């Protein structure tokens, strides 16, 4: 009888612990999914603003010229970074290099380095990874003596 009761109690404890673990894992997955969703929404809204800027006949090179930025670097060389490089081609703005944590796997028309590399001084760094702008700005400020600007801010200011 004692064995049966102990077995039943052990089974209930195991089921409870298992349910708790499954709930925790599912909760973690849900948080990751929500974070990714928010990140992609911000990216979509930024790119939508860029389309509006282009529809108004504006070019981002004007922003940099008005600020006196001739040589820039771009942090975040995914879609937005590549698009910015393309937009600034054949303008008076030189994109000196890109910065990306996945520098080894990115192929671009400019040099791509990581934050750990020695960063050449430029007039400004444009951060395309807008979700993490605060963290990136803090790290870059310790390595460079230049303006660090969010691409999102540029798009709403131009």
Task: State what each model feature region is.
Residues 2-158:
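Hydrophobic, well-ordered beta-alpha structural blocks that scaffold small-molecule cofactor pockets
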